[in-house]
Amino acid sequence: MNKKILQILEYDKVKEQFMNALTTAQGQQELKDLKPLTDKEKIQLLFDEVADFRLLTQENGLLNLGKTNDLTEILRRLELEASLSGKEFVEIKKVIQLGINIQRFFDEAENVETPSLAITLEKLVDLSALVKKLEIFDNAGSLYDNASLELMHIRASIKSHQSEIRKIMQEMLTKNLSSLSENVITIRNDRQVLPVKAENKNKIAGVVHDMSASGQTLYIEPNAVVSLNNKLNQKRIEERQEITRIYRELASQLKPYSFDIRQNAWLIGHIDFVRAKYLYLAANKATLPELTTDKDITLFAARHPLIEAKIVVTNDIKFDAGLNTIVITGPNTGGKTITLKTVGLLTILAQSGLPILAADGSRIHLFDDIFADIGDEQSIEQSLSTFSSHMTNIVHILAQADENSLVLFDELGAGTDPKEGAALAIAILENLRERNVKTMASTHYPELKAYGVETQRVINASMEFNIDKMQPTYHLQLGVPGRSNALEISRRLGLPETIISVASQQISDSEHDVNQMIEKLEEKTREVIESSRNIKKIERENQSLHKDLTKVYNQINREREFELEKAQKEAQEVVKKASLEAQEILKNLNDKAALKPHEIIAARKELEGLAPTIDFSKNKVLKKAKAQRGLKQGAEVNVTSYGQRGKLIRLEKDGRWTVQMGSITTRLNEDEFEVIESPEQIQAKTKNVSKKVTSKVKAQLDLRGMRYEEAELELDNYIDQALLANLIQITIVHGIGTGVIREMVQKKLQKHRHIKSYEYAPINAGGSGATIAILK
């Protein structure tokens, strides 16, 4: 795309609006290098990245990025094996750490997928191992003492020497106060010295390192610390040598990763730029327009990004595929130029992958180039008039524009005789129309109104003017040609009516009719626009509501999945625990060579007890699901409110069912009846269990005539058989006799854990000679 259009439309000024949101040098450089694209897939990917980031932020909060500087020169020197400073190592560390933080943020993000951003993230190289090597620096770029064992020893020695020197110097300071010009210990040539009065220089033996400007003070290093200072300086030399060695070793370890570090820096910069686009999008209520290749430009609530938000006027601009040319007529200062610039600028921004100031649903066609003749480009050096300057530019545009270009003309044909100017304007527009070039032109020539009405694929437009307030509203009116309001404005400003009447007589009847027609058309257009705005407001509210509902729905689904997963895990734990206990029970059973029937029953009860009892009767979800499976035409139901059976006839629109109960037909809600399963359904759910029955168990046992031991064994076996046969009540006839057998029966029943209760039989059924027992 030509550079001139970027200058005319002030493209770089709009780019500057993104700069404050960028925190990395690489992100700022990507913004500076940004140019409009023509590849739809590349632009769409840029939009998709912003959409991904918006979704990510909504679900997980805003990604925080730290400030980083440009590593280009640092990495170049690293590759040349030149020495780096501690601060430069810290700059490398910042970039590496930031890459790790970004990767961690995306890895830990929940409830969102970012396929477009994943393309960039997949290229990030894991350099976490290098961070550990760079942790030897503090934020200022100084090495920590533990950067190496040698450095630790050297610095410990330095501190020891400094402490010893400080102690001696403090003693000498106190002892020689009268000989000093100041009561301080100072530094000269990296050595601690005392400020001695010149006349007292012989009182303190030592080395003179400096003299004050007046010559009144000598800075003397006492002989008592010369040796210690020499040792201290030697240790400092060793410290510098060790630091240099550490730097060199670290640089050699980083050099093989210089390409990865550089790539990560640019990838981080790209993420930073995507983040800045999102922040611009959110702060300005901007949109990511739909990209088209069918020459359709549809902008809803379009705003010029360089006009302050408080005063900017939004416009709906529909320059669809069926139109070639829009001719905006009417007086100056109405906003025609801003409208042209808005269309061109928003198109360029969209083709740069940037959000545009418009409402959702906007569409932008991708142009190969955009040309404009806007503003006064008169050249004094070339001695060109205003008209000549414009015409030179127009000649260039006509030579370069093709069917995939957008052309913008401001005041086409101005600067010359009105009739000739209008004729030229029509001829230029017709040339572009015949070549199928998308064109928008503003003009104040009335002749172009007729051209807009009479010519196919050309439409008139105008900027609305409020007569009552005598000022433009800056609203674009498509389909309505502009009209002059000179007479009405003059009347309101106080021009005598006689003059206005004479002026009005100079205007032909046809022109009066046209102006009246335009006035009515403007009124109708305003009504349509107002109605359209109300509809769009409702649409936006519906979209917002739909968005909120979708978010709530997704949240409910996520919570449901979480609860299901949680329940599944709990169920697995229950099953696992029950399985282990069952295995233990079975093991105990296997350990016994033979089991009595009552022991088998006890084991079975124990196994049954492992299964958790769950009450689903109050589970509304299951009840609803069950009801939905059974609710169909012809299904048999039990009508709970009537206590009768019925049949479902049909489902009504209000959600109720028509139910036939004999000769009665009524409408019922689903909670007023229950589905009755058919015999086939019951049979399908029933599992056949074969039982081997050796003999039919009677409900009565007669122990009369048996010995004690025989009766006791017989009673045990009988109770076991009764339990296996699922008997509820048994009768044990023991007779009265001596009472020994009766007492044995009573004790057995009392201790048996499967006996719920027992009592003597009624008088007519044996009285105290028989005992009736109820089984659990």
From Swiss-Prot:
What top-level branch of life does the organism fall under? Bacteria
GO BP: any one term:
rescue of stalled ribosome
Key word Acetylation present: no
The GO molecular function terms of this record are: ATP binding; ATP hydrolysis activity; ATP-dependent DNA damage sensor activity; endonuclease activity; mismatched DNA binding; ribosomal large subunit binding; rRNA binding
Name the EC number(s): 3.1.-.-, 3.6.4.-
Q: Which InterPro entries match?
A: DNA_mismatch_repair_MutS_C (IPR000432), DNA_mismatch_repair_MutS_core (IPR007696), DNA_mismatch_repair_MutS_sf (IPR036187), MSSS (IPR046893), MutS (IPR045076), MutS2 (IPR005747), P-loop_NTPase (IPR027417), Smr_dom (IPR002625)
Q: Give the record's keywords alphabetically.
A: ATP-binding, DNA-binding, Endonuclease, Hydrolase, Nuclease, Nucleotide-binding, RNA-binding, rRNA-binding
Q: Where is the Smr domain?
A: 701-776
Alphabetical list of PROSITE patterns matching this protein: DNA_MISMATCH_REPAIR_2, SMR
| Record's function text | Endonuclease that is involved in the suppression of homologous recombination and thus may have a key role in the control of bacterial genetic diversity. Acts as a ribosome collision sensor, splitting the ribosome into its 2 subunits. Detects stalled/collided 70S ribosomes which it binds and splits by an ATP-hydrolysis driven conformational change. Acts upstream of the ribosome quality control system (RQC), a ribosome-associated complex that mediates the extraction of incompletely synthesized nascent chains from stalled ribosomes and their subsequent degradation. Probably generates substrates for RQC.
Q: How does it assemble?
A: Homodimer. Binds to stalled ribosomes, contacting rRNA.
What protein name does the entry list? Endonuclease MutS2
Show the taxonomic lineage: Bacteria, Bacillati, Bacillota, Bacilli, Lactobacillales
Gene encoding the protein: mutS2
